[in-house]
């Protein structure tokens, strides 16, 4: 990684800087990127990810992907047992099958992890209500200023608020 301070035309090659992607290329970029980050998703979840495409545009993108074989339909089970249709990249299907036997080690997730970014989706899938409370007045916070969710295997099981003690470099 390198920071450069100069005029754009002196840093970015002209053929890259002047490229104007078509709407279809932009749509494909947004939908592909969203699905890559989410792993599996509905059209609405794809459209909500960047808030760049509409749900109907995402549905059309999904339909094209299903016809071409690039995407595959799957059913996911929500925390309440309800099934929902979602799509996954066909090439990712074998990897998903491999990773279903998830490690039970604990992971502390960032509040901005793609799995948590859409709070309603995370609550549906994991049955775990999570809200970041940095902008909530202290008296109204339920869990703390900057709380991290803890994942064990494929389940969100707890929250932790980590505070740094600057003088001793300890985490509390």
List PLM regions with ranges.
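Long, low-complexity intrinsically disordered regions
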Residues: 1-107, 112-116, 121, 128-132, ...
